[in-house]
Structure formats: C-alpha cells, structure tokens
From Swiss-Prot:
This is FMN-dependent NADPH-azoreductase. Induction: Constitutively expressed. It holds the Pfam family FMN_red. It catalyses: N,N-dimethyl-1,4-phenylenediamine + anthranilate + 2 NAD(+) = 2-(4-dimethylaminophenyl)diazenylbenzoate + 2 NADH + 2 H(+). The keyword NADP applies. Its EC number is 1.7.1.17. GO terms for molecular function: FMN binding; oxidoreductase activity. Belongs to the azoreductase type 2 family. The lineage of its organism: Bacteria, Bacillati, Bacillota, Bacilli, Bacillales. Keywords: Flavoprotein, FMN, NADP, Oxidoreductase.
Length: 188
C-alpha cells in the first residue's frame, strides 16, 4: 500500500510540510510508504518564493510525476497553509490537473496549518473539492497552528504539540482502515 501527500505551500520547509513528514513516520509503523510531493520543491506554476522560475520542461516533468504518483497511490492527503481563509492557489492549480480518475473512491486525508487565526475552513473547502472528484474525505482532519511546532537545529520544523501528535496517529490509523476495508473497490 502506498500514499501520496501533496503539499500546497509556496514556502520550502513549511509547517504544513513538517506535519506531512510527521505523518510519513506514522505510516511507516503500518509498513506503508507515504511519499510527499511538495509543490514548493516541485512547482507547477509561477508563484515561487525562492526567486527562481522553473523552465517549462521542468514544470511539465513535475506535472507528469504528480499524475503518475497520484494514479498509483492507494490514498491521497492534501496539505495546505491557510491562505486568506481557504486553501492555497498552488494546491488549486495542482488539483486542476488531476481529474476524477486520480481520486475516484480513494480515501483522502486533509491537513492544514495557520500562521495567524487558527481555522479549519481551508479543509472544509477541500472536503467539497474531494467530494466533487469522487474521493472519500476521511472524517478526521488536522488543522494546526504555527505554535504547535518547534524548530530543529537545522531550522526545519517538527510537530511539538502532544495533542496533535495523538490526532496525527488517529488520522493515519483512520486512513489505513479506510484503505484496508474499502467497500468501494469495485467502483474504482
């Protein structure tokens, strides 16, 4: 079993990507590979905080990689920062390239992080998108705040809040359960 976590932040080493890294460790306890596709590192559009714009060929290759990984995944996780009360345009751009074939009857987890006001609104918006793509948004979602993280010596973030660590384990267990017990396999 394998999954794909798509991170829709323009910032490299974002809080959302730190949460995704934390989740991948918990999937490993179930012998599940969950790969991260970080749109800050593999951009599909022109918004780029690093100051470099990738070539058209690089963008096309990134899109090809995303589509192949999404199609092969048994589940997907969509991760976003809270941008103006919703999910990021970067994630929206990526989702515009993935049709129902990539989501149909697959469990989809939703994770997000807010730097300002804590809000799960971006995840509520994504829940509607997942439904329209025929995916199955799992009930447990994770909406963190910057204060739920601490910094490693190298400057990268890690999830430091014990309540969210517990919620992350529940989230992973729920996705694994949905994949292992899917009554929808015949509908794919």
């Amino acid at each position: 079993m394998k999954g794909l976590i798509i991170i829709g932040s323009a910032q490299v080493n974002s809080h959302t990507s730190a949460l995704a890294r934390y989740l991948t460790e918990h999937f490993k306890t179930h012998d599940i590979e969950a790969e991260i596709f970080d749109l800050a590192e593999k951009p599909l559009n022109q918004l780029d905080f690093s100051g470099t714009t990738p070539s058209i060929d690089e963008i096309k290759q990134n899109m090809k990689d995303l589509k192949e990984k999404a199609m092969a995944a048994d589940f997907l996780i969509l991760g976003t920062p809270n941008y103006h009360g919703s999910y990021s345009g970067i994630l929206k751009n990526a989702l515009d390239h993935l049709n129902m074939d990539y989501f149909k009857m697959k469990p989809v987890g939703l994770i997000g992080n807010s730097g300002g006001i804590v809000s799960s609104e971006p995840l509520s918006h994504l829940r509607v998108i997942v439904r329209s793509l025929l995916g199955i948004a799992v009930p447990t979602q994770i909406a963190t705040h910057d204060s739920d993280f601490a910094k490693n010596e190298d400057g990268s973030y890690y999830l430091n809040d014990s309540e969210f660590q517990l919620r992350a384990r529940l989230f992973v267990d729920q996705i694994v359960s949905f994949v292992n017990n899917s009554p929808y396999e015949h509908l794919k």
